[in-house]
Amino acid sequence: MSSSKRIAKELSDLGRDPPASCSAGPVGDDLYHWQASIMGPSDSPYAGGVFFLSIHFPTDYPFKPPKVNFTTKIYHPNINSSGNICLDILKDQWSPALTLSKVLLSICSLLTDANPDDPLVPEIAQIYKTDKAKYEATAKEWTKKYAV
């Protein structure tokens, strides 16, 4: 199956069975460039926020993972100021059996359960580990400022 057929199938599957609190689709006519949105999980400091992501599929998708970046600023130990996401399935744990829907759900999980032991932003990870209340307060503040 060509990458464009696979991406079109995932788009149709997403339309039929969208993951909870996520949406995604192509930007204009470009099947290889999508925009997604994730609602901040209610049990996280990101509750009430809507976070936008940019998704670029490589031409050899699904054999290579999509490039997914936050375009909304977010305070998180695994997401840096450029919107890069530290998530194993977007790197060495990628498998062609994974879909964009599963990727979005994994990113949602990351918002609820950060991984401070594999941080992209060590300073935030340190605050997360030593002063969780301060971390949550700052994350809520950023959510209000950038994602509401």
UniProtKB/Swiss-Prot annotation:
Name of the featured protein: Ubiquitin-conjugating enzyme E2-16 kDa
Note: Present with 981 molecules/cell in log phase SD medium.
One cellular-component annotation, GO: nucleus
Pathway: Protein modification; protein ubiquitination
Modifications the protein undergoes after translation, according to the UniProt entry: The N-terminus is blocked.
Covalent cross-link Glycyl lysine isopeptide (Lys-Gly) (interchain with G-Cter in ubiquitin), where: 91
CDD domains from the UniProt entry: UBCc_UBE2D
Family, as annotated: Belongs to the ubiquitin-conjugating enzyme family.
Keyword Transferase in record: yes
Active site per database record: 86
Its biological purpose: Catalyzes the covalent attachment of ubiquitin to other proteins. Mediates the selective degradation of short-lived and abnormal proteins. The RSP5-UBA1-UBC5 ubiquitin ligase complex ubiquitinates RPO21 forming 'Lys-63'-linked polyubiquitin chains.
Oligomeric and partner information: Component of the RSP5-UBA1-UBC5 ubiquitin ligase complex composed of E3 RSP5, E1 UBA1 and E2 UBC5.
Top-level taxonomy: Eukaryota, Fungi, Dikarya, Ascomycota, Saccharomycotina
Alphabetized UniProt keyword annotations: ATP-binding, Isopeptide bond, Nucleotide-binding, Phosphoprotein, Stress response, Transferase, Ubl conjugation, Ubl conjugation pathway
An example Gene Ontology molecular-function term: ubiquitin conjugating enzyme activity
SUPFAM superfamilies assigned to the protein according to its UniProt record, in alphabetical order: UBC-like
Keyword set includes ATP-binding: yes
Tree of life domain: Eukaryota
InterPro entries in UniProt: UBQ-conjugat_E2_core, UBQ-conjugating_AS, UBQ-conjugating_enzyme/RWD
Catalytic activity: S-ubiquitinyl-[E1 ubiquitin-activating enzyme]-L-cysteine + [E2 ubiquitin-conjugating enzyme]-L-cysteine = [E1 ubiquitin-activating enzyme]-L-cysteine + S-ubiquitinyl-[E2 ubiquitin-conjugating enzyme]-L-cysteine
